[in-house]
């Protein structure tokens, strides 16, 4: 009953939710199973880590470039649609290549265009919902649902068929994403004054603010910590003889916990400060990674550990978006999102993926990789504890 009340059926909600659904459905395919695909191509752990690092490194600059273009053009929906279309085209190139450098190029090109979508979609959603944390969380949970569906479906499909079905699944999802972006409509009265779009408000003072610097570094460390999970978790579970559907269910369980957290984010924002939510998320994440190699051989304890994804992702992500929304002015939102996603997800993800690739050693160094991850998240928590309130 509560879930039914939480889903307002109006066209704005449906359009935004469908875009989030397909965007994160693709993440539900790529995050767990790209390593399976690359492993099937014959690449070793170091090569897999390098490819993941190169893909993620494109996020360092690309989001800011796309965001600046969006701010100056005042056409965020055009950026979203263009990114979705070009991501579809570039991902489709995987059908024709099987060697290391061509595949690396295709995936890097795909990521370059894919990064154009989420920052603008977040800004468009926050603008359309008038900065309502509750409505945003309800829309965003459909992204989690998309992730769950693909994590389970792809795990079983790849297990039953072949790792090469990965490409076809990605193309289908990206086609759905592109179609969903065509259904998005601009907010009424939301067009910017064209006479002012050529001189966007500077954001340097916002970027050098001590509170933002602490927030940025903590986010960077969190993303470094996620690298073993995002890039190698499916391979990790496969080494413990879990089936394809079991791998998908473990990943989906984390996303279910994430959805529940998103539902209650409005209440959490009323009861706790942003800083306390960020510290809590980082601390729980550190514990999660430290426990991962310890509980991996027990399905029950691994499932319990996966529930902490509610804090690791949902609470931290929602708090981060609220921080960015309040820290930057309306005209700075796209660039603020771009700097955050480019620096935190780009640098953090790339560094984490590269280090994990070096530590993994075909699975023999998995424990060391998760210890590195836990230490990184713990450092992030300490930074936020001493951050300026």
Per-segment meaning from a language model:
Residues 156-173, 358-377:
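A membrane-interface helix-boundary motif in multi-pass transporters
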Residues 9-56, 211-250:
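Helix-loop boundary and gating motifs at the non-cytosolic
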Residues 21, 90, 100-117, 220, ...:
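Hydrophobic core of transmembrane alpha-helices in multi-pass small-molecule transporters
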Residues 108-142:
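Cytoplasmic helix-loop-helix junction between adjacent transmembrane helices
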Residues 3-9, 185-219:
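Juxtamembrane intracellular "pre-TM" segments in multi-pass secondary transporters
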Residues 78-92, 276-291:
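Structural signature of the two symmetry-related core transmembrane helices
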Residues 62-75, 158, 261-273, 360-361:
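Helix-to-loop junctions at the C-terminal end of transmembrane segments
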Residues 95, 176-186, 371-389:
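Multi-pass alpha-helical transporter architecture, strongest
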């Amino acid at each position: 009953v509560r879930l039914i009340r939480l889903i307002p059926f109006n066209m704005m909600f449906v359009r935004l939710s469908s875009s989030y659904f397909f965007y994160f459905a693709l993440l539900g395919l790529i995050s767990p199973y790209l390593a399976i695909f690359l492993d099937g191509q014959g690449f070793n752990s170091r090569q897999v880590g390098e490819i993941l690092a190169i893909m993620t490194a494109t996020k360092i600059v690309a989001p800011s470039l796309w965001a600046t273009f969006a701010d100056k053009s005042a056409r965020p929906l055009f950026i979203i649609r263009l990114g979705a279309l070009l991501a579809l085209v570039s991902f489709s190139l995987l059908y024709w290549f099987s060697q290391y450098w061509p595949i690396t190029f295709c995936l890097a090109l795909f990521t370059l265009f894919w990064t154009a979508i989420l920052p603008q979609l977040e800004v468009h959603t926050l603008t359309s919902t008038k900065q309502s944390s509750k409505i945003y969380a309800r829309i965003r949970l459909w992204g989690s649902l998309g992730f769950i569906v693909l994590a389970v479906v792809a795990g079983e499909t790849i297990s039953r068929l072949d790792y090469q079905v990965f490409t076809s699944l990605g193309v289908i999802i990206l086609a759905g994403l592109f179609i969903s972006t065509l259904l998005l409509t601009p907010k009424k009265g939301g067009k910017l004054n064209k006479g002012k779009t050529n001189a966007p408000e500077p954001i340097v003072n916002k970027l050098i603010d001590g509170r933002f610097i602490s927030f940025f570094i903590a986010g960077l460390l969190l993303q470094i910590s996620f690298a073993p999970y995002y890039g190698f978790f499916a391979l990790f579970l496969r080494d413990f003889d879990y089936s394809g559907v079991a791998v998908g269910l473990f990943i989906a369980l984390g996303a279910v916990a994430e959805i529940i957290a998103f539902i209650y984010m409005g209440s959490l924002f009323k009861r706790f400060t942003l800083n306390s939510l960020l510290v809590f998320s980082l601390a729980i994440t550190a514990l999660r990674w430290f426990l991962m190699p310890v509980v991996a051989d027990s399905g029950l304890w691994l499932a319990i550990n996966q529930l902490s994804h509610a804090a690791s992702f949902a609470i931290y992500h929602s708090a981060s978006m609220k921080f960015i929304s309040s820290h930057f002015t309306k005209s700075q939102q796209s660039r603020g999102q771009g700097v955050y996603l480019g620096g935190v997800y780009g640098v953090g993800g790339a560094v984490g993926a590269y280090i994990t690739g070096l530590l993994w050693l075909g699975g023999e160094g998995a424990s060391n990789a998760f210890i590195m991850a836990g230490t990184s998240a713990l450092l992030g928590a300490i930074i936020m504890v001493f951050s300026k309130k």
